[in-house]
Amino acid sequence: MTIKAISVDIDGTITYPDRRLHEKALEAIRLAESLGVPVMLVTGNTVQFGEAAAILIGTSGPVVGEDGGALSIKEGKLRKRVYLTNMDEEWILWGELKKRYPEALLSFSMPERKAGLVVLRTVPVKAVRELIKELGLNLIAVDSGFAIHIKKPWINKGTGIEKACEYLGISPKEVAHIGDGENDLDAFGVVGYRVAVAQAPESLKEKADYVTTKPYGEGGAEAIEHILRKFGYLPEEKT
């Protein structure tokens, strides 16, 4: 197996628990880039957030935002945004959800979003899923650990990575993905190598080829270095 790119979740994977970027993860990402391995930031957050992070961190790969619904492709000094869907039934769900649960709140990032709703965790994800079923909507609700992402069933990190790979000219099987949440499962389904960070749910760890010993950003750094060593970009550590 050959790995030509690394895709990595942001929140909880290359950050501290409070979402500050972890220094060790930053160093590891820049090490990968210096070795010719493009890093793709893959997030449930907005594509604009991902773009800003990519610029500050220094990643060269595409940005996958909105859980796979939006991409940002680097073209020279400019970036092109690609949206894989739009919202319709999502707003029907939101109207009914707000009626039944007045405490329901949308993410402050909604004005920038085009591919799905993000509801804060003031409402149980189970209640959202039950309402989707009751209304007969073709939507799913995924708990990222930070918020509830409501979207079309075919919009996920896996489809976003597949689209990003078209622009890179590589197969998704030549990508190693690192994540820490339920919304990373679809990414695990399309890539060639899978790493779960230590605090990830068991559902993700069960599908991983490697689980880090350290959590959060320190675990993200461990994951990147593990991938670089396993696939020959760095020498194996002596035991």
Swiss-Prot record:
* Cited InterPro entries: HAD-like_sf, HAD_sf, PGPase
Reactions listed under catalytic activity = 2-phosphoglycolate + H2O = glycolate + phosphate
Q: Where does substrate bind?
A: 157
Record GO cellular component, one term: cytosol
Question: SUPFAM superfamilies from the entry?
Answer: HAD-like
EC number from the UniProt entry: 3.1.3.18
Per UniProt, Mg(2+) binds at 9, 11, 180, 184
Query: A Pfam family for this UniProt protein?
Result: Hydrolase_3
UniProt KW keywords: Carbohydrate metabolism, Hydrolase, Magnesium, Metal-binding
Task: Look up the record and name the cofactor or cofactors this protein needs.
Answer: Mg(2+)
* GO MF annotation, one: phosphatase activity
Annotated active site residues, numbered on this chain, are: 9
Return the similarity comment.
Answer: Belongs to the archaeal SPP-like hydrolase family.
User: What is this protein's function?
Assistant: Catalyzes the dephosphorylation of 2-phosphoglycolate.
Q: Which PANTHER family match?
A: HAD SUPERFAMILY HYDROLASE-LIKE, TYPE 3 (PTHR10000:SF8), PHOSPHOSERINE PHOSPHATASE (PTHR10000)
Entries under NCBIfam families matching the protein: Pglycolate_arch, PRK01158.1, SPP-subfamily
Q: Give the protein's recorded name.
A: Phosphoglycolate phosphatase
The organism of origin for this protein:
Thermococcus kodakarensis (strain ATCC BAA-918 / JCM 12380 / KOD1)
